[in-house]
């Protein structure tokens, strides 16, 4: 079966590898254009483009699936298109190009968390279980009938990066199985059933920690926005980046935002009980252990995060 693969970030690479390993004829890859990376802003291929070039697969670079891109896809006469985090909308004109349409691997148990940031929103919401689904792409946002699903436990220490990494590997197997079923004429997609929730793309402001909130909510938020866009707070009007924070339920006497140095640990008060800081990155500096950061403060006991 001739497959067009559409994807851009590193989490899509395991799916591309799985399809190649399973023996599918991946005729081309659709990915976002090369983007500037690092301080020197060097134009760099997407992780999917880089892997496709290693595998000798043709690469179509497009910021959007317009008429020209659709025509380029049609030249490859794909039987099916598999899409994993491509980063753009597939319009109606392109949906009908592959014989069997487009199959999307989405990192949630649809219809939960439709949208661009399902894993991040799931962690922030405090879900105990999430998963992945393959579904038939249609004009609505993640609304198409589902081919298959898998479940994944959300561990107490999981960041969005951790959970996405696991789902990218197990999801790759699910995607390969789905395409095999389609190829064998055995696929039977079912309408989505259940409560709908939405997962819009995270903004920088989603990473800001409000110390008036309960500790558990802050722990979940910090994990959900790690590695991107990252958790942060402010001190004297300057942004301070934070790695995920740990719960310290035995410490209940710290006012929200106030800090306390406890040996090598730095505690911060919240709306419920204290949390323990992970690494800290003050403005203009590198990430550092919290105790090192606290040693640079003139009067730590007077510091209050804003």
UniProtKB/Swiss-Prot annotation:
Superkingdom, taxonomy of origin: Bacteria
Catalytic activity field: L-methionyl-tRNA(fMet) + (6R)-10-formyltetrahydrofolate = N-formyl-L-methionyl-tRNA(fMet) + (6S)-5,6,7,8-tetrahydrofolate + H(+)
E.C. code: 2.1.2.9
Any one annotated GO CC term: cytosol
Binding site for (6S)-5,6,7,8-tetrahydrofolate: 108-111
Keywords per UniProt: Protein biosynthesis, Transferase
Gene Ontology molecular function terms on file: methionyl-tRNA formyltransferase activity
Keyword Protein biosynthesis among record annotations: yes
Pfam family, any one: Formyl_trans_N
Xref: InterPro entries: Fmt, Formyl_trans_C, Formyl_transf_N, Formyl_transf_N_sf, Formyl_transferase-like_C_sf, Met-tRNA-FMT_C, Met-tRNA-FMT_N
PANTHER family, per the entry: METHIONYL-TRNA FORMYLTRANSFERASE, METHIONYL-TRNA FORMYLTRANSFERASE, MITOCHONDRIAL
Record's protein name: Methionyl-tRNA formyltransferase
Source organism per UniProt: Paenarthrobacter aurescens (strain TC1)
Lineage, broadest ranks: Bacteria, Bacillati, Actinomycetota, Actinomycetes, Micrococcales
